[in-house]
A protein has these predicted regions:
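ATP-dependent carboxylate-amine ligase
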Residues: 45, 73-75, 109, 119-122, ...
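Short glycine/proline-enriched loop/turn "hinge" motifs that connect secondary-structure elements
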Residues: 12-19
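Acidic, Mg2+-coordinating active-site environments of NTP-dependent enzymes
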Residues: 20-170, 193, 247-248
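Short beta->alpha connector loops
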Residues: 6-10, 63-64, 265-266, 288-289
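Short glycine-rich, flexible loops that bind phosphorylated cofactors or substrates
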Residues: 11-12, 30, 66, 233-234, ...
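Short active-site oxyanion
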Residues: 1, 53-57, 258-259, 280
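Residues at the C-termini of beta-strands that transition into short coil/loop
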Residues: 7, 79-82, 93, 229, ...
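Switch II (G3) loop of P-loop NTPases
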Residues: 1-9, 170-176
Length: 305
């Protein structure tokens, strides 16, 4: 089998012809290309219609846009948090590391207990998608659960990279969309810690402008937020949006939070290094080069695995 992570940007995933298609979620993104959510749903509908009848779509039916795309499809398997889903996670609990465990029901009946070694409720959903795929292919249930337990994550996805000199934990994450940001921060909140710091680098001017209000609403779980300059990637600064405007809107939305704009990476590292305390969590967040700040903060002897 060949497994690939497909991206919808520029309809690039429509060049694929998979036998199994997994829909984790559908959300407003890449609006510089799609313009609106209806166009995004049309592309996803085309994607699932390209899957042959002898194949299957495995999808999270708790997402309303996914449900829209799945309408009328017979060759589908669903997962989620309700017994109407084919696979349903119940009795979800988290340990002090934020690692979840849950009971997995299949078609309304208890199937197995799942324990993960990666944090966050979003990984409960991810694990159900992986489980459903392997189960469909005939893999033994015990093999699936053992494999899920052994999985410890991947680069730049809630990636523990080390500690600061005083003992704050440094985590790097690729999240650059409001939905991803909330999932990452929620995962961090489940870990035993003191203050939660986030160093956020917005990614592209078009995304920042199109989802401005959503970004403003996304950081209610943090204690300290530092916003760096927007990472331009492929774009030019012609959209009348800035990190300073984000800072102002976020300060108004979250007056009880420590929120500030800082453009220089070295200054950010110096400030956080002086002010973050023992057992705090520091997340460098974004799809650009914000991870460099974590490297500045980290002591060499504490390098993460």
């Amino acid at each position: 089998y060949f497994v690939t992570e497909a991206c919808e940007y520029m309809d690039s995933f429509l060049h694929l012809r998979p036998r199994i298609g997994v829909l984790l979620n559908i959300d407003s993104d890449h609006l510089d290309y799609f313009k609106n959510i209806n166009n995004i749903k049309k592309s996803f509908r085309q994607f699932v219609e390209q899957i042959p009848k002898e194949g299957v779509v495995i999808a999270f039916d708790g997402n309303p846009f996914v449900r829209d795309v799945l309408q009328g499809m017979e060759n589908r398997i669903t997962y989620g948090y309700t017994e109407s889903s084919d696979y349903c996670a119940v009795n979800i609990q988290f340990d002090d590391n934020g690692f979840p465990e849950y009971d997995l029901h299949y078609k309304g009946e208890m199937l197995c207990h799942v324990h993960l070694s990666v944090p966050g409720e979003h990984n409960v959903l991810n694990s159900m998608a992986a489980f459903a795929t392997a189960h469909y292919l005939g893999v033994d249930t015990e093999v699936i659960t053992d494999t899920l337990l052994s999985y410890r994550g991947t680069h730049r996805h809630f990636d523990f990279t080390g500690y600061t000199e005083i003992g704050a934990k440094i985590i790097d994450d690729y999240a650059h969309h409001p939905t991803e940001i909330k999932a990452t921060l929620s995962a961090a909140k489940n870990i035993r810690h003191n203050d939660l710091w986030c160093i956020f680098q917005p990614h592209t001017y078009t995304r920042t402008k199109a989802l401005f209000d959503d970004f403003v609403d996304s950081f209610g779980m943090v204690d300290h937020l530092i916003i760096t300059d927007i990472y331009a990637a492929r774009e030019k600064d012609v959209y009348n949006v800035s990190s300073q405007k984000l800072e102002e809107a976020m300060q108004e939305k979250h007056p009880d939070k420590d929120i500030r704009y800082m453009g220089d990476f070295e200054s950010i590292a110096e400030y956080v290094g002086k002010n973050a305390g023992k057992d705090d969590i520091i997340i460098t967040m974004g799809a650009g080069d914000v991870y460099k700040i974590g490297k500045m903060l980290r002591t060499d002897e504490s390098k993460g695995e």
